[in-house]
A protein has these predicted regions:
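A short, flexible loop at the N-terminus of ABC-type nucleotide-binding domains that lies
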Residues: 8-12, 21-34
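Conserved beta-strand
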Residues: 15-18, 30-40, 71
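ABC ATPase NBD coupling module
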Residues: 26-29, 80-97
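Short beta-strand immediately N-terminal to the Walker A/P-loop
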Residues: 45-46, 98
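The feature captures the beta-strand-to-loop junction immediately N-terminal to the Walker
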Residues: 48-50
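Helix-to-loop junction immediately C-terminal to a conserved catalytic motif
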Residues: 63
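Conserved ABC transporter NBD signature motif
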Residues: 71-79
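Short coil-to-helix segment of the ABC ATPase nucleotide-binding domain corresponding to the Q-loop/switch region
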Residues: 109-119
Length: 123
């Protein structure tokens, strides 16, 4: 695909006003606060920031592992913002590949959920 074709095909990823809030007891932790990002199909993006700055949360939402609390996420022309759990699983199986930086548990999932996510991703 040449540059002209990739531009006419639209962005590979659009995130607008994305918020992710976790409830921790009676408190709320804001992991993302109105994040905006647009990535072209032929573009490479590096996320750099300190631990706890929201990089993993942003990637997890873009890849359909998490749903945003608010905002819009469009991947390859499909708005996945309000996908059900089943639709997200299908989306990940068809469209997403993850390479995690190390073999660690996902900290915001229970041990059972960590095992189930590996099972779901493997098909």
């Amino acid at each position: 695909m040449n540059n002209q074709e990739s531009k006419s095909a639209g962005p590979a990823l659009i995130m607008k006003g994305v918020r992710k809030v976790y409830e921790v007891g009676s408190d709320e932790v804001v992991a993302l606060d109105h994040a905006d990002l647009e990535v072209a199909a032929d573009e490479l993006v590096a996320l750099i920031g300190p631990s706890g700055s929201g990089k993993t949360t942003l990637c997890s939402i873009a890849g359909g592992l998490l749903t945003p609390t608010d905002g819009t996420v469009v991947v390859g022309g499909s708005d996945i913002s309000d996908f059900s759990s089943r639709e997200l699983t299908d989306f990940r199986r068809r469209s997403v590949g993850f390479v995690f930086q190390s073999v660690n548990l996902v900290p915001f999932l229970t041990a059972r959920e960590n095992l189930l996510v590996v099972h779901e991703l493997s098909g």
